Amino acid sequence: MSRRLDLDALDLSTKTIPAQAAIGTYMSSTIIKAPASSVWQAVNDTDSWPIWNTFCPGATIREQPDTTKSRSGRLQLGTKMTLHLNWNPRGTKPKQMDVGLVVTEFDPPIKGRETPGRIAWATDSSAKGFPSWLLYAERVTELHESEEWDGEECQSVTQVLSWESQRGPLAYVVRWFMGKNFKMCLRVQADDMTSFVEGQKL
């Protein structure tokens, strides 16, 4: 049975930023006709991002907590990375920006479990860039799997909910001057993910 989320009733709090304390919150949602495990693979494997992720076409892993996976592009709890963002994902001239982040939550989806799969990353104070008191951001991605009838059989579908909350003085600048574009970029990323994951099934 489908259990799609009511986007107007969500609590968009992150681990460290309550919803009511966020200066800016930017969200996207998409339905992917695939199990949550397939979506998790796309989100978690940064080596695949250049193939499908036009908003964030690359990530440099700066540090892995598990030294046996130090050269792996797969995220884990505590991974420190630099995201290479493109703020013009549908244009011909990229607008690039690098952001240092650390994975703060890592909970892969489990078939049949009520709670969603969830991964989050946040501003890494040890990386180059704005100090965290000036701009602190936390990005959460949740994978909610359910079953839907397609007229012939039940199939697994995943509702991907992704949002970023920000605080600090520069968060006002982002909201005023970049908020609309940020929402567009998240929408593009959601569409890209949907096309990529569903295409993997072919």
UniProtKB/Swiss-Prot annotation:
InterPro entries: COQ10_START, START-like_dom_sf
UniProt-listed CDD domains: SRPBCC_4 (cd07822)
SUPFAM superfamilies with a match to the protein in the record: Bet v1-like (SSF55961)
Traits of the deletion mutant: Does not affect the production of oxopyrrolidines A and B.
Pfam families, per database record: Polyketide_cyc (PF03364)
Function: Part of the gene cluster that mediates the biosynthesis of oxopyrrolidines, polyketide-amino acid hybrid compounds with feature structures of tetramic acid. Does not seem to play a role in oxopyrrolidines A and B biosynthesis.
Protein name from the UniProt record: Oxopyrrolidines biosynthesis cluster protein O
Taxonomic path: Eukaryota, Fungi, Dikarya, Ascomycota, Pezizomycotina
